[in-house]
UniProtKB/Swiss-Prot annotation:
Extra remark beyond the main annotation: A single active site specifically recognizes both ATP and CTP and is responsible for their addition.
Gene name as annotated: cca
Keywords carried by this UniProt record: ATP-binding, Magnesium, Metal-binding, Nucleotide-binding, Nucleotidyltransferase, RNA repair, RNA-binding, Transferase, tRNA processing
Reaction(s) catalysed by this chain's protein: a tRNA precursor + 2 CTP + ATP = a tRNA with a 3' CCA end + 3 diphosphate; a tRNA with a 3' CCA end + 2 CTP + ATP = a tRNA with a 3' CCACCA end + 3 diphosphate
CDD domains the record matches: NT_ClassII-CCAase
Known function: Catalyzes the addition and repair of the essential 3'-terminal CCA sequence in tRNAs without using a nucleic acid template. Adds these three nucleotides in the order of C, C, and A to the tRNA nucleotide-73, using CTP and ATP as substrates and producing inorganic pyrophosphate. tRNA 3'-terminal CCA addition is required both for tRNA processing and repair. Also involved in tRNA surveillance by mediating tandem CCA addition to generate a CCACCA at the 3' terminus of unstable tRNAs. While stable tRNAs receive only 3'-terminal CCA, unstable tRNAs are marked with CCACCA and rapidly degraded.
Natural source organism: Coxiella burnetii (strain RSA 493 / Nine Mile phase I)
Similarity comment text for this entry: Belongs to the tRNA nucleotidyltransferase/poly(A) polymerase family. Bacterial CCA-adding enzyme type 2 subfamily.
One Gene Ontology MF term: magnesium ion binding
Protein's recorded name: CCA-adding enzyme
Length: 376
């Protein structure tokens, strides 16, 4: 047995035909850690699963959570395309659906391998051979029916950068793009796959694959393969695993308003959008800090909101330093300036009962004096 920890002892699944499937089997065969396990149940009904204590969670097809492990158990099913888009399917889940039929509906051969409780591998579509040859290949032409598979394959290519895409699979992806299937993708799923890709070993390959099949110009027209942002992402990949930092790096050569438009289109979290816009808008100013006088430095701190949002500003300077690929004293210097500005004593201003514009001008004067003392 490979990863069936405690499998046979569970009363909830005794006498059921249960198989481990998908990424868990694939990663185990590749010697990678298994992060989550998905199971397929053959020959059972929804009523039988609930009677055993499983909690139904699937809206479109029968998926259940194990009462103890909370892992997902799905009844074996087939699917049929009835409309455009990733939701344009009807599903058939019944006791007469075989394991092989269930595996056939999966996207890639390396994800269509099942494992029995005894550790026997069931591989009707050549997944093990493709793992050996490092090939990403579709199970059947039904691959082209689900546009999400284009994103998933592009993301998987970032996780396994030494795997090639089978020519026939790439042709199917191109057909999907030409047929307009990509247009049916929802913003949330596009962002989900992009964010996951940014955290993988070679994130630039996500865009390379999308470009190869023609989807890049449709989904991300702002991003150019030959752009400085792509080159910057490539250069920082081995320096930070953070999807947040990598996202900001990728868009560092774009105008802030373009970044805002992209972020709005795909409902990118504010944390990501804010940092990317900050880097694009003020990155060049940060590089030239040594040339600034006290007035310019204070304006820089206020515009970047460095005095109030220290964590975001730290992410900003970290990103800028990665992009510039230089080791400098800039971070230390700017942090000393921030500390000095924050340490300005405002009690004398309060004692004078200064308010409004008078208070603001007096505070600015004290801050400028604090900065001048440090840089002079």
């Amino acid at each position: 047995m490979l990863v069936f920890y405690g499998f046979l002892s569970s009363r909830s699944i005794s006498h059921l035909k249960v198989y481990l499937v998908g990424g868990a089997v694939r990663d185990q065969l590749l010697g990678l850690p298994v992060k989550e396990k998905d199971w397929v149940v053959v020959g059972a009904t929804p009523e039988e699963m609930t009677a055993r204590g499983f909690k139904p969670v699937g809206k479109e097809f029968p998926v259940f959570l194990h009462p103890e492990t909370h892992e997902e158990y799905a009844l074996a099913r087939t699917e049929r395309k009835v409309a455009k888009g990733y939701k344009g399917f009807t599903f058939y889940a019944a006791p007469d659906v075989s394991l092989e039929e269930d595996l056939k509906r999966r996207d890639l051969t390396i994800n269509a391998i099942a494992e029995t409780p005894e550790g026997q591998l069931i591989d009707p579509y050549g997944g093990q051979e493709d793992l050996k040859n490092k090939v990403l290949r579709h199970v059947s032409v039904a691959f082209q029916e689900d546009p999400v598979r284009v994103l998933r394959l592009a993301r998987l290519a970032t996780k396994f950068p030494d795997f090639s895409i089978h020519p026939d699979t790439l042709e199917l992806m191109k057909k999907m793009v030409c047929a307009g299937e990509i247009d049916a993708l929802v913003p949330e799923r596009i962002w989900q796959e992009l964010n996951r890709a940014l955290g993988n070993e070679k994130p630039t390959r996500f865009f390379t694959v999308l470009n190869q099949c023609g989807a890049l110009a449709i989904l991300f027209p702002e991003i150019k393969m030959e752009g400085k942002g792509m080159a910057a992402l490539q250069s920082v990949t081995d320096k930070t695993p953070s999807p947040l930092i990598r996202f900001a790096t990728l868009q560092s050569d774009l105008p802030p308003e373009i970044i805002q438009k992209l972020a709005g289109r795909y409902r990118v979290p504010n944390e990501y959008a804010d940092l990317a816009i900050l880097v694009a808008r003020f990155g060049s100013d940060y590089v030239n800090l040594n040339r600034m006088d006290e007035t310019s430095l204070l304006n820089f701190l206020l515009k970047t909101d460095a005095l109030r949002r220290q964590e975001r500003f730290d992410q900003f300077i970290f990103t800028c330093d990665l992009i510039s690929s230089t080791t400098s004293s800039q971070p230390k210097k700017i942090k000393e300036i921030i500390k000095a500005v924050k340490s300005v004593d405002i009690k004398p201003l309060q004692e004078k009962q200064l308010k409004g514009e008078a208070f603001a001008k007096a505070l600015e004067k004290l801050r400028l004096e604090a900065i001048r003392t440090l840089i002079s």
